[in-house]
């Protein structure tokens, strides 16, 4: 009997191009270590290079290579937001937005099997009413079907003090207090 995704005895090379499998094809686009984390960050509103680099603690050259690949693959779009010096932000394309169910499923799987004992590091909530996102990507409070555009992220009980979402929340609170 032939396995679904190629032969078991075939040695896996540096890529999946010879695999006749949709999962292998998807991994060619998003399977690199940083790719899904970059997509998650952009989905949650982090779109500029410096913020992505800071939040992910990834080397600048690695981030640039991954962003270029995601743009070339049509997952992200690069948009100019400043002329001098030229600076860009990264937006999800329709192809990138279609990864929303995958991102939520991986987050929820990680919350169940790989989160700190304190709980989920990131909580997703409905922008409209504040309800939690359930396993079907529905709002647990109002029942609305949610897309990436409908959701806000906040630091969960498992987020360390230095988590980017905690730092951003503290900075916003300080700005409000100073105003």
Protein language model annotation of sequence segments:
Residues 1-8, 111-179:
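C-terminal regulatory/oligomerization modules of transcriptional regulators
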Residues 2-27:
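Short, Lys/Arg-enriched N-terminal segment that forms or immediately precedes the first helix
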Residues 21-62, 176-179:
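N-terminal helix-turn-helix DNA-binding core of bacterial DNA-binding proteins
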Residues 31, 82-105:
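Basic, amphipathic "hinge/linker" alpha-helix immediately C-terminal to the N-terminal HTH DNA-binding motif
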Residues 36, 73, 102-113:
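Alpha-helical linker/hinge and terminal dimerization helices associated
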Residues 39, 47-52, 99, 109, ...:
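Extended, folded domain segments that form the structural surfaces/walls around functional sites
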Residues 49-81, 85:
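Canonical helix-turn-helix DNA-binding module
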Residues 55, 89-91, 123-125:
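Short aromatic/hydrophobic contact patches that present stacked aromatics
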């Amino acid at each position: 009997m032939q396995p679904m995704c190629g032969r078991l005895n075939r040695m896996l090379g540096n890529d999946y191009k010879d695999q006749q499998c949709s999962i292998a094809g998807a991994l060619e686009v998003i399977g690199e270590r940083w790719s899904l984390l970059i997509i998650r960050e952009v989905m949650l509103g982090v779109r500029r290079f410096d913020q992505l680099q800071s939040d992910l603690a990834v080397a600048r050259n690695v981030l640039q290579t991954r962003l270029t690949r995601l743009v070339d693959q049509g997952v992200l779009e690069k948009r100019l937001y400043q002329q001098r010096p030229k600076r860009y932000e990264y937006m999800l394309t329709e192809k990138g937005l279609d990864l929303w169910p995958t991102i939520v499923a991986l987050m929820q799987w990680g919350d169940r099997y790989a989160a700190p004992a304190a709980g989920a590091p990131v909580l997703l909530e409905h922008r409209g009413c504040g309800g939690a996102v359930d396993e079907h990507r529905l709002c647990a409070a109002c029942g609305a079907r949610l897309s990436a555009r409908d959701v806000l992220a906040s630091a969960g009980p498992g987020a360390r003090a230095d988590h980017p979402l905690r730092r951003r929340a503290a900075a916003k609170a300080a700005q409000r207090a100073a105003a």
